[in-house]
Regions:
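N-terminal secretory signal peptides that target proteins for export/translocation
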Residues: 1-2
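Extracytosolic ligand-binding ectodomains
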Residues: 5-9, 20-433
Length: 433
């Protein structure tokens, strides 16, 4: 089964057009190529590869999940999953890989290493918001290189006051997940007060906790405290503070192992042993379930909802079998779909903007590439409809699911059944809806 994944771009005349994603696509004749010495100009000689980068946390399952999806996107460049890399405009695609360590230092260092290749066109990454904000996004923006993230969710990355001009993301803004979790807590469960526990110094964790507190307050609830974990903040002391505050629910947005340590500490006190706990996708891990054992039962986990993906025929009958052949297993979440879409948008933008000079040299203007992404409207990808706005947010909305342990996707795969689902759009949220 073949299905071409096409971005719909708004061209200067205002018409919406679609391009074909197969090997028969040809670059435009040279007409307005960028200056040879210009900072945005990449020249790809005959027989030379197009260089793309990946900047991921490959020590985690989510990072390797994304990497596998990028490989499948390259496989599908010729319009079929056949286990062999396709070509883009007659050129092989070579992916340069760097580790971002889920840290600002790792993100900056990895980005600096990637731009040592002067012909680097674009990068898929980062895995962690902390590795991007003021780190990888700053380095790559200065170098005029696109950074398209499949899994960054921190709201500040696309805040107009902070967003870097070459930064885009396919993952939904965490303002949407925070709003959905607040709906679950306040509306569905009737919990009126909460304490949040975040990873000290981590952008994703801090901002998701903060956005949840804002959403809960807007609904009429109360955030009693936002507590850091990690570093000099022992989990036993955090549990005692939570017991003293007596909230209706605790939201933990920290990573492993601090997340399970905090949950274990909460479960160890008589006053909080039955206190409802919600964790974010950062803590929705097999390690958490193993560490808590029987105490994990009933712990809720929120994450992007990927159960809907198999409703799509291309995903179910094309992508998923290819993923299984390549990896021997199933994807663990939704970020693999974001990665496939992110790569497809980059490839389509290259097709639309590249020009060929006499002699066959392919010229890619990275500035035209950036503008092409800003023109994406109504692209129907694996992860849903994408429209890339001026802030760099491309996901039009978010589907969020809440699962009750042990029925988590990491344990049950696609068979995991959410206890709560919510669909939010960025337009709704911006309007306060």
């Amino acid at each position: 089964m073949r299905r071409r994944l096409i971005a719909l771009l708004v061209i200067a005349s205002g018409l919406v057009v679609g391009g074909c994603a197969g090997s028969e696509d040809a670059p435009q004749p040279a007409s307005a190529a960028c200056p040879v010495s210009g900072p945005t100009c990449v020249r790809v000689g005959v027989g030379q590869p197009i260089y793309l980068g990946e900047l991921l946390n490959l020590t985690t399952a989510s990072g390797t999940d994304v990497q596998q999806s990028v490989r499948l996107a390259i496989d599908y460049l010729d319009g079929v999953f056949d286990g062999a890399p396709g070509q883009l405009l007659g050129h092989d695609v070579e992916v340069l890989s760097q580790e971002e360590e889920c840290s600002a230092v790792g993100g900056r260092t990895g980005a600096l290493r990637l731009i040592q290749e002067p012909s680097l066109v674009a990068v898929v990454g980062t895995t962690c918001s902390t590795a991007a904000l003021g780190a990888a996004d700053a380095v790559l923006s200065e170098a005029n290189v696109l950074l398209v993230s499949p899994s960054n969710t921190a709201p500040s990355l696309t805040d107009p006051e902070q967003r870097r001009r070459t930064y885009f993301r396919i993952a939904p803004n965490d303002a949407l997940q925070a709003s959905a979790v607040a709906d679950f807590a306040y509306v569905r469960e009737g919990w009126r007060s909460a304490v949040t526990v975040h990873a000290a110094g981590d952008v994703y964790s801090e901002q998701l906790a903060g956005a949840f507190g804002e959403s809960l307050t807007l609904l009429g609830g109360e955030l009693l405290a936002d507590l850091p974990v990690g570093g000099d903040a022992p989990t036993e002391e955090i549990a005692r503070r939570i017991a003293a505050l007596a909230p209706d629910v605790v939201l933990i947005t920290a990573f492993s192992p601090e997340c399970e340590q905090a949950a274990l500490a909460i479960r160890s006190l008589a006053a909080t042993r039955t206190l409802p706990i919600v964790v974010s996708e950062a803590c929705q891990t097999a390690e958490f379930l193993r560490a808590l054992g029987a105490d994990a039962r009933g712990v809720y986990a929120s994450s992007p909802d990927f159960t809907y993906l198999e409703e799509d025929a291309f995903y179910r009958d094309g992508f998923l079998p290819a993923y299984r052949r390549q990896t021997g297993g199933d994807p663990i979440g939704v970020f693999h779909a974001h990665a496939f879409d992110g790569f497809a948008l980059i490839a389509d933008a290259i097709r639309r903007t590249a020009v060929v000079e006499p002699g066959g040299v392919l010229v890619i203007d990275r500035e035209r590439l950036r503008r092409a992404l800003l023109e994406v409207r109504g692209y129907q990808g694996l992860s849903g409809r994408l429209t890339c706005g001026s802030t760099g947010d491309c996901a039009e909305g978010a589907r969020v699911a809440v699962y009750a342990a042990p029925e988590w996707p990491v344990a049950r795969g696609a068979g995991a059944k959410p206890v709560f689902r919510s669909q939010k759009t960025l337009a709704q949220f911006s309007l306060g809806g």
